[in-house]
Amino acid sequence: MKLSELIAHRNQLLEYNIADVAYHARHKLSDVVHTVKNSVIQPRTYTQTMEEDLDNVVDVFDQFGGTLNGLIQELDFMIEVAEKTYYQDSAVRYNEESSRYGKLDDKTNTDVDQQILDRQLEMSPETQKMLSDRINSYIDWKYAGLVIRPGKEHFINDLVGLDPLYLIDWGNALLTPAVSKFNTEYQDRLRLYIEPPTSTDVLSAIPNNQLGLCLAFNFFEYTPIDILENYLENIFKKLRPGGTLAMTFNDCDRAHCVALVEKTYGFYTPGNRVKATAKRIGYQQQFTWNDNQNLTWLELRKPGALDSLKGGQTLAKILPKTLAKSK
């Protein structure tokens, strides 16, 4: 049985609230007993028998709920065993892909970059507007911003109010579509950095305690759990107190997201582990949302209050337009 099937079955069972069913059933049956008990018509011992039956019904509901919980626990154990292979396969696949990045012939390298840029999360216009509104709620020129893999996403336009604005990706070709959205003057203000996929000291070029907002949209869908957790650790260091990480990832607590992993369209990153890791690091969960497809949006906040010593908006350091800094 596939892991996606195990998780789908577990999630379906979790939707059943046996305690709620038992509560309503007991109250309905109690109404029946009350009607019988308060009637002047009392043939034989039906009232006593019905009261005893009601107690038995409650016990049976408790037993049924316990059996269901036992089944869910057994499924959790089966998932824990099965997911070890998914973690390993995701890591191996990522390591193979990242070790080859930029090291093949020019045409193949260009094709790989284009494939990465063409990856899109499908969104309804309503979802796109909702996410834009949430991003815009964090925009303030007093604070710096970072976008990891800006790609072709329209969200880059929402972040121009952050000063300075850092853009990071694996190579210049991946940054070009985002940079080209702006005029020459603003392009020169962007802080561009190259960070190879094999880098272990991620985001080392970004100053600590500087970012008011970090956006990673449609990036962690293509990283295994250890890479994602490494980014969480380092982004936390880069955020100012009160700063926010807004991110999407392939939430494998959802069965259809696990199915993407089984088709090698994504990597295995369960939401329960991602959120537990974030909590351990020190993040506070601000907001989470998912649609009926593959998008899971998560906002994590570094504790503290945002403050700034800036007295007026200043220009970022001028950088060459065509070449990004390389670590």
Feature annotation, model-predicted:
Residues 142, 210-212:
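Local beta-strand N-terminus motif with an aromatic residue
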Residues 2-205, 223-229, 244-327:
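Class I (Rossmann-like) S-adenosyl-L-methionine-dependent methyltransferase catalytic domain
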Residues 229-241:
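A short glycine-rich, Lys/Arg-flanked "PGG" loop and its adjoining helix->strand segment in the class I
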Residues 201-205, 211, 236:
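A generic structured-segment signal
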Residues 215:
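A conserved beta-strand element that flanks and buttresses the S-adenosyl-L-methionine
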Residues 219:
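Hydrophobic adenine-recognition pocket in adenosine-nucleotide-binding enzymes
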